Amino acid sequence: MRLTQYLASKLKNFSNLPKEYIERSKKQVYWQTPKEINYLPRTVERKRFRYTTNRSWTGQFRQQNMPGTVRRKVLVEPIEDWSFFRGDRIEVLVGKDKGKQGIVTQVIPERNWVIVEGLNWHYRKVGGEKEFPGIIIKSEAPLHVTKDIRLVDPSDLQGTDFEWRFTEEGEKVRVSLRSGRIIPIPETNNQTHDYKTPNAYIEREKDTPGAVVGEITFQPKLSTFEMDIMEEMGIKEERTPVKSYWY
């Protein structure tokens, strides 16, 4: 469970949505104590979700995890260093597209999956009803990152194994074990729903400028909140406190 929560946090990089919004959109609370002073905060809520290719803040994800449904537990192998990103060129190692190369378009770290553009696809029917047979669409199936794909070396465009290393500047990079060439992380990985690159983003009226965010406005003091209000309002304390004793 902890692994799933950790991997789910990586989705924010693509969604560019507040973490509180993502957690609230998938939250399913069955019961909670009243918000009174004589109650401890306790809730009964769903903690296990079935993750698929649908993002956790979408309606499709909620439909697949409707309240009250029990799904078979999926065991996921933990990956310490996630090494595949959107925009990576990879080589397929299994299936009908074995040996072909493609570009990663979607990453699902909760299941150790990636989706490659135009590869490992199949036909499926959607929109079927009683009076409408539905339509057939082409859909790419996910590939497992530990056994179904491998990265392509940019020096010779051949599949290769790699490892993480540190440069002299302390930057962590992927290095091909065959050629020693650095495999850079694509710029596509920085894209979100709001912008292609962070530098190309245009600030809007409701955005907080970076200069305002970095401005230090808090000044630590020994005075209490009430003392600060009195100082700003020009109120002087002229009363003499009464003697008190502690036993």
From Swiss-Prot:
Key words of the record: Mitochondrion, Ribonucleoprotein, Ribosomal protein, Transit peptide
Example of a GO biological process term: translation
Keyword Membrane in record: no
GO molecular function: RNA binding; structural constituent of ribosome
SMART domains (UniProt xref): KOW
The UniProt record lists the keyword Transit peptide: yes
Coiled coil spans: none
GO CC annotations, alphabetized: mitochondrial large ribosomal subunit; mitochondrion
Any Pfam family matching the protein: KOW
Compartment(s) of residence: Mitochondrion
Transmembrane parts of this sequence: none
Chain ranges of the KOW domain: 84-117
InterPro entries: KOW (IPR005824), Rib_uL2_dom2 (IPR014722), Ribosomal_uL24 (IPR003256), Ribosomal_uL24_CS (IPR005825), Ribosomal_uL24_KOW (IPR041988), Translation_prot_SH3-like_sf (IPR008991)
Membership in a protein family: Belongs to the universal ribosomal protein uL24 family.
Subunit annotation: Component of the mitochondrial ribosome large subunit (39S) which comprises a 16S rRNA and about 50 distinct proteins.
Record protein name field: Large ribosomal subunit protein uL24m
Organism whose genome encodes this protein: Drosophila melanogaster
Gene, per the UniProt record: mRpL24
